[in-house]
């Protein structure tokens, strides 16, 4: 079984796939217009919702989030889509972030297992989740964004605002390996 990456047409979506391949994690990168039924037939062990330019171009992401009963990781726009589906709120950031930032890990969890209390990550966004959805907890923040990472309290649904797939997040591969372990143990 592989991880399916939903391409929301962001500049880094192909890097997610390449990073997973480098880590020997089988994956498929598919457009966000792929139907839920087609994805279900692929029998994925997990879903990654990639970044993208606009909440108006998210294809079938909401249906995927609501109907797939497997681990999901949303990155950047994917994080914002998860928040939206579960009743959170996304707004334009007071300060757009296009830089390496210091991530503060607030709670030990499977996604950041073995990482420690802080991590250098790459931020590339003009919008951010400002209201945490009900039944979610904040896993990490930064001085640029209060909700850098979140997790559903009862489901293996994670959202991260930053980009683990780029070289400016030196330990991003560990985050993907941890997500893969979450998928394998589900």
Curated annotation (Swiss-Prot):
Q: Does the keyword Ligase apply?
A: yes
Where the record annotates domain Glutamine amidotransferase type-1, the positions are 2-186
Q: What does this protein do?
A: Catalyzes the synthesis of GMP from XMP.
> What is this protein identified as?
GMP synthase [glutamine-hydrolyzing] subunit A
Active-site residues annotated for this sequence: 76 (nucleophile), 163, 165
Name the UniProt key words of this record, in alphabetical order: ATP-binding, Glutamine amidotransferase, GMP biosynthesis, Ligase, Nucleotide-binding, Purine biosynthesis
Task: Give the pathway listed in the UniProt entry for this protein.
Answer: Purine metabolism; GMP biosynthesis; GMP from XMP (L-Gln route): step 1/1
Q: Which reaction does it catalyse?
A: XMP + L-glutamine + ATP + H2O = GMP + L-glutamate + AMP + diphosphate + 2 H(+)
Q: What is its EC number?
A: 6.3.5.2
Q: Which CDD domains match?
A: GATase1_GMP_Synthase
Q: According to its record, what are the GO cellular component terms?
A: cytosol
User: Gene behind this chain?
Assistant: guaAA
Subunit structure, as described in the record: Heterodimer composed of a glutamine amidotransferase subunit (A) and a GMP-binding subunit (B).
Organism whose genome encodes this protein: Methanosphaera stadtmanae (strain ATCC 43021 / DSM 3091 / JCM 11832 / MCB-3)
GO MF term set: ATP binding; GMP synthase activity
Q: Tell me the superkingdom of the source.
A: Archaea
Write down the NCBIfam families for this protein, in alphabetical order. guaA_Nterm (TIGR00888), PRK00758.1 (NF001975)
């Amino acid at each position: 079984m592989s991880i399916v990456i939903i391409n929301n047409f962001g500049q880094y979506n192909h890097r997610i796939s390449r990073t997973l391949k480098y880590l020997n994690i089988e994956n498929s990168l598919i457009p966000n217009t792929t139907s839920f039924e087609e994805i279900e037939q692929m029998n994925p062990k997990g879903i990654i919702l990639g970044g993208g330019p606009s909440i108006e171009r998210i294809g079938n992401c909401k249906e995927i989030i609501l109907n797939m009963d497997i681990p999901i990781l949303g990155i950047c726009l994917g994080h914002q889509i998860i928040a939206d589906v579960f009743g959170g709120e996304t707004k334009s950031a007071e300060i757009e972030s296009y830089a390496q930032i210091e991530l503060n890990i607030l709670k030990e969890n499977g996604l950041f297992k073995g990482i420690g209390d802080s991590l250098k990550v790459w931020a590339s966004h003009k919008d951010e989740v400002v209201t945490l959805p009900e039944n979610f907890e904040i896993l990490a923040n930064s001085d640029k964004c209060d909700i850098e990472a979140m997790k559903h309290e009862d489901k293996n649904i994670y959202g991260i605002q930053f980009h683990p797939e780029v070289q400016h997040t030196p330990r991003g591969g560990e985050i993907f390996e941890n997500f893969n372990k979450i998928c394998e143990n589900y």
